[in-house]
Structure formats: C-alpha cells, structure tokens
A protein has these predicted regions:
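Flexible coil/turn and secondary-structure edge motifs
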Residues: 1-206
C-alpha cells in the first residue's frame, strides 16, 4: 500500500519523512515530485510539481490512519508555502481520500489557525535525483560500502536502506533497532556502527 505526501520545506527533501522510514510497518520510502503537469521534473526544474515523499507500507503491520497521525503530529500544517513546498496528502483511492479528509477535520479542531494542507488525488510520481534518496545514509560512506549498495534503483528500493536511513538520522529508538535487528541481517560491525551513530545523535544538515 502507498502513502504519499509533502511534509516540510527542506533543502534535502529526504529529511521530511525520516520518522516514517523506521516506523513500524514501513517497507520503503522514496522522495520525488508530483502533483504538477511538467513532464520529467528535476529538483532544479520543478515546474508546478510539489516535493513529495512516497511511503510503501505493509497493511498487516500498520495502516493509513497511523501514517496520517504521524503526518499531522510532525509538521506545522498551518504554514503557508509555495506549491513546491506546500503541505499535501496525495490519495490513491476513495478510501484514502475519506480518511485524509477526516483526519484533516480532526486536526483542525485541535488548533485555531487554519490548516493549509491540500488533499489531492495522486498523479505520476517522479523520482528525485539519486543524491536526494536516503540522504542521511549516503552521508556515511563506510556504512554504504559495508552494505555494498550504490545510489540508484537498488538503494531506492532497499528495505534495509529505508530502515537505516531513519535510524541513522536519529528518528528511531535504540530499543526498536535492537528488536528489528534480526530481520535486517546486518553484520556485527554494521550493527555496532549504527548503534554508535544513534547514540551520538549527530544529524547531518544539507
């Protein structure tokens, strides 16, 4: 199942959804552009698209409503932005549309300022350039080399890279990492490296 949204204006679009990268049930994340009419947009030639994060999740382990709750909790939906950076949820079917609208109404009741988030039908999702994908993970060359993974399709589709991108960015707990570790099939050296990175709490800025 897919969950697609725009969360925050960040120079590196990969940062906005790191909390979801290591959230329960999330299989894969990609950053890119959507919602506009310009064919084949790029970061430097975006046209009328919005920077977007696509999240693929396992519906047996989490659900759309849980992801929406995280979305509202972790950004300021009242901030007015240009279309490139606007807050938006892109729905893929009528059920997602209904849930997104209901969650927006619920979120609005808890604050006085008007929410600016747009609920839009999903259109073509264009992947952002490789250097945007799993951005924080790519700032750890030793780890990338140890994982034997290169920027490109393999990195973009990797479950392990998705999870580690969140953990290495400081958006997961050490307890959750330890619980998940058997399913990640990491070497002891890689696991120790991730632990140290999480404990250091150093987040990379663009």
């Amino acid at each position: 199942m897919k969950f697609q949204l725009r969360q925050l204006h960040l120079e590196c679009p990969d940062f906005g959804f790191l909390r979801h990268s290591c959230a329960s049930g999330v299989i894969r994340t990609r950053v890119g552009f959507s919602g506009g009419t310009k064919p084949n947009p790029t970061y430097r030639s975006l046209g009328d698209h919005t920077e977007t994060t696509e999240v693929v999740y396992d519906p047996t382990k989490t659900n759309y409503s849980n992801l929406l709750t995280m979305f509202w909790k972790n950004h300021d939906a009242t901030q007015k932005c240009t279309r490139q950076y606007m807050s938006a949820v892109f729905y893929h079917n009528e059920e997602q549309k209904r849930l997104a609208m209901e969650s927006l109404e619920k979120a609005q009741k808890s604050i006085t300022k008007p929410i600016q988030t747009q609920i839009l039908e999903a259109s073509t999702f264009y992947e952002a350039e490789d250097y945007h994908q799993k951005y924080l993970l790519q700032q750890h060359p030793w780890l990338m080399n140890a994982l034997d993974i290169e920027p490109g399709p393999e990195l973009n589709q990797s479950y392990v890279a998705t999870r580690l991108n969140g953990y290495i960015g400081g958006y997961g707990t050490l307890a959750n990492f330890e619980a998940e570790l058997p399913n990640l099939h990491l070497s002891d050296k890689i696991a120790d490296y991730v632990r140290r990175a999480m404990q250091n709490g150093n987040r990379v800025n663009c």
